Regions:
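Short beta-strand-to-loop acidic/aromatic patch adjacent to the donor-nucleotide binding site
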Residues: 84-96
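Glycine-rich, basic loop-to-helix element that forms the pyrophosphate-binding segment
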Residues: 59-82, 88, 104
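A conserved acidic beta->alpha catalytic loop
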Residues: 20, 37-46, 62
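Non-catalytic, C-terminal membrane-associated alpha-helical segments of glycosyltransferases
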Residues: 270-347, 430-462
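Active-site-adjacent helix/loop segment of glycosyltransferases
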Residues: 183, 220, 224-305
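Acidic/His-rich active-site region of diverse nucleotide-sugar glycosyltransferases
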Residues: 69, 95-203
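A short, conserved alpha-helix in the catalytic core of glycosyltransferases
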Residues: 178-180, 185-204, 208-236
Length: 462
């Protein structure tokens, strides 16, 4: 069997993965490990060579994304003698695997000759007791992935360390109600995907998506050959939660590649409706002040219509900074009034103590706190409350009256309040790890772009 891992500048993650692989129950002498490095510059290759002398490494000369990386590995595998490998196990570089993860996937394929692909149940690395997905189905009307058991939790696992979970009993069919040991699905993520080598070669390489939806398309294409796709409730991996990842340049690939997927496997109406939904997202990002991310949606549509695939050179003007450096904003003498909404969990984002310190150091700094009608409790003392009415219309009028009264409005990347983006000179978008300072949206800019928006709306899918 061949294990294919693709990595790019995630040295510590891929080392953790390889360490977890050293503890799996599947016989090590039956495994070859191939790591595809996408031109990392963080010392990944050097660390791999120093710690693991029984793996093979192929270095790409540039970052080819997950698509190009796996295609490099698959091309190498397809060139081997047909009898050399019966199975190929594709793994993300930022997962750790349960000791029985591979054995249980092999058991599924060995017992079911008509199943060509078996995938693991994906748990969340940051919340190890929570399921991220147990396979998924693909809605070919819009490209949405319908995840099984999404965010379902195993309460008895709370408080357990990940190292203990990797060797504990991991049969979810025994701890979750109405959960089968395995089930047929339409898609399993290449975070942990076992496929029969002959079927992989028959299916071919991944479409040139660079990242995202490439494994979805590959699963759909494999199923077209008459083979089943299954997920195992006994094979577990832990992966960094997508919920913890803030939307950025990846939005381009998500929105472009889903159009290629629908164009190939659905109909023109689905493509048309998805283009229009993408245009709605473009308008939303314009309205909240993330204009650079808004443009990615239009670029995604344009490149799809022009047949452009692969990697795109994306340069975003606004950069994310570590949350610990937010103090430089709060201590800027030019910043005198800041408004904070209830949607920001100041303890979770670790900025509470930074605000407390800034308010002590700068008595002239006024911090306003927007209090929702359903929860009047404030997270910080010494803030000036702004009580919001219950009526939605009244709340919008309140925001309208507050416009131009603040230097900075804080916004949560996870739960953005649209009218809040319009009441300050700048918006500081924050999440658990980073923040990004952006200018407030401009109505004149949005109005100038409306004709182009309307034109694209009516040309969608033609």
């Amino acid at each position: 069997m061949l294990i294919i891992i693709v990595t790019w500048n995630k040295k510590d993650y891929v080392l953790d993965l390889l360490n977890s692989l050293s503890s799996i129950t599947f016989p090590r002498d039956q495994l070859d490990i191939l790591v595809i490095d996408n031109a990392s510059n963080d010392g990944t290759v050097e660390a791999l060579k120093a710690q693991f002398d029984d793996i093979q490494i192929i270095r790409n000369t540039e970052n080819l994304g997950g698509t190009g990386g796996f295609n490099t590995g698959l091309t190498w595998a397809y060139d081997q003698a047909e009898s050399r490998y019966d199975y190929l196990w594709l793994l993300d570089n930022d997962v750790v695997v349960h000791q029985n993860a591979l054995s249980e996937l092999v058991a599924v394929l060995d017992a079911n000759p008509d199943i060509a692909v078996a995938g693991s149940t994906m748990m969340q690395l940051d919340y190890p007791w929570r399921i991220n997905e147990m396979g998924a189905f693909v809605d070919l009307q819009n490209g949405n992935l319908l995840f099984n058991r999404h965010y379902e939790e195993i309460p008895s696992w709370r408080g357990k360390q990940i190292d203990d979970l990797l060797v504990d009993n991991a049969d979810l069919s025994q701890v979750l109600m109405h959960c089968q040991p395995q089930m047929d699905v339409e898609y399993v993520a290449a975070a942990s995907l076992l496929i029969r080598a002959p079927v992989a070669k028959q299916t071919g390489l991944w479409m040139d998506f660079f990242i995202h939806f490439d494994d979805v398309e590959w699963c759909l294409r494999t199923a077209k050959t008459g083979h089943r796709i299954a997920v195992s409730a006994k094979s577990l991996i832990w992966h960094l939660s997508a919920a913890a990842k803030v939307p950025n340049w990846i939005l381009y690939y998500d929105n472009r590649n889903v159009l290629y997927l629908l164009d190939k496997y659905s109909d023109k109406l689905a493509v048309k409706n998805t283009i229009r939904r993408t245009l709605k997202k473009y308008l939303y990002y314009q309205l909240i002040g993330k204009t650079d991310l808004a443009e990615l949606h239009v670029q995604a549509i344009t490149d799809f219509e022009q047949g452009t695939m692969g990697k795109k050179n994306i340069q975003l003007p606004y950069k994310f900074e570590k949350i610990a450096t937010i103090s430089r904003i709060l201590n800027d003498p030019a910043i005198k009034k800041i408004v904070v909404p209830w949607t920001i969990n100041m303890q979770a984002s670790n900025i509470e103590h930074i605000f407390v310190s800034a308010m002590k150091n700068r008595p002239e700094l006024e911090v306003f706190y927007i209090v929702p009608p359903h929860n009047p409790q404030r997270q910080l003392t010494n803030t000036i409350p702004i009580l919001m009415p219950r009526s939605v219309l009244s709340r919008y009028l309140k925001y309208f009256r507050l416009r131009n009264k603040f230097d900075i409005a804080l916004q949560s990347d996870y739960q953005t309040i649209l009218p809040l983006s319009w009441i300050a000179r700048e918006n500081l978008f924050t999440n658990d790890e980073y923040f990004c300072l952006r200018p407030a949206p401009q109505l004149s800019r949005i109005i100038r772009q409306l004709p182009s928006f309307v034109k694209k709306w009516y040309q969608a899918g033609k």
